[in-house]
């Protein structure tokens, strides 16, 4: 695969993911009920604000749909990439570059947090961030979970259990979100958790089953010799995802420090 084709495919995948990420289900679900979620509670279009103002069923629907935005973006990129297999020609180049499908899922998170109207307003108002904030999206937690699920079901399972454990114990959705996404890049450094199931095993260069039949060779579980390129790229993407999602929670962090953050699923609608 020549560099020109690779750059073209990367741009295409980023565009696809960002476009899908721009579909803000929080707004669509709220408008189907005759209201605009941006005028309720915190004004955020994410599942938490929807739950607090429109109920748990609406919140759950938004959470699931936001989850599948990033997962579906990665899957669409996978289908396109496989369709390009024969035009690429070089099988080794095709296998080694397969990791770029995850750019679609990552771009969907960006599109979810900062849709095109946000940037349009930002440039139109000469970088008036307060005005552009009115058109910002969600905080990216559900989409980040979908992105993790597109990489590895094991990674998603760990994040799922960790998130709900912290949420149920602390009663803070924001704290659970921040801690879970902060640890997300770490899981990607463990090869057998970072299981690229969407790609063929031959392409992912990884054995999904750790060598439990050789208990004295624990180091074999952390064998980076074959799939280090996939692990490096997904680690960087998940690191950027963590930075983005934590940044989107900056106001929540301040309220947590001050002891002013709302408990999960409180009935009163203040700020999120």
Curated annotation (Swiss-Prot):
One of its GO terms (cellular component) is plasma membrane. InterPro entries: G3P_acylTferase_PlsY. Disulfide bonds: none annotated. This is Glycerol-3-phosphate acyltransferase. GO terms for biological process: phospholipid biosynthetic process. The keyword Transferase applies. The lineage of its organism: Bacteria, Bacillati, Mycoplasmatota, Mycoplasmoidales, Mycoplasmoidaceae. PANTHER family: GLYCEROL-3-PHOSPHATE ACYLTRANSFERASE-RELATED (PTHR30309:SF0), INNER MEMBRANE PROTEIN YGIH (PTHR30309). It comes from Malacoplasma penetrans (strain HF-2) (Mycoplasma penetrans).
